[in-house]
Curated annotation (Swiss-Prot):
Keywords for the protein's UniProt record, in alphabetical order: Ribonucleoprotein, Ribosomal protein
NCBIfam families: PRK00596.1 (NF001861), rpsJ_bact (TIGR01049)
Family label: Belongs to the universal ribosomal protein uS10 family.
Gene name linked to the record: rpsJ
Record function comment: Involved in the binding of tRNA to the ribosomes.
GO CC terms: ribonucleoprotein complex; ribosome
Protein name in UniProt: Small ribosomal subunit protein uS10
Length: 101
């Protein structure tokens, strides 16, 4: 086959993303394919500002932050063995995986 596979991982917890990327790298290396990465992509931060009081005190506000972490993996010289190993791989439920062939 020998095609390039690009895997993007996204999660709100950076530990989950790192562990998932490490798991994928170990699995792919056992099949004999070449892996580049994990490459950390920029962190997206969303900040929400909310009034603390429902009625008065406009000056009193509270801010909440939601950060999403991303990693990028490229797999070269993959075989059918590599693809089968990736399909059978169990990843945590908080990680979004996007695969492009």
């Amino acid at each position: 086959m020998s095609q390039k596979i690009r895997i993007k991982l996204k999660s709100y917890d950076h530990n989950l993303v790192d562990k998932s990327a490490e798991k994928i790298v170990k699995t792919v290396k056992t099949t004999g394919a070449v892996v580049t990465g994990p490459i950390p992509l920029p962190t997206n931060k969303k900040i929400f500002t909310v009034l603390r009081s429902p009625h008065v005190n406009k000056k009193s506000r509270e801010q909440f932050e939601l950060s999403s972490y991303k990693r990028l993996l490229d797999i070269y010289s993959s075989s059918s063995k590599t693809i089968d190993a990736l399909m059978k791989l169990e990843l945590p439920s908080g990680v979004e995986v996007e695969i492009k062939v």
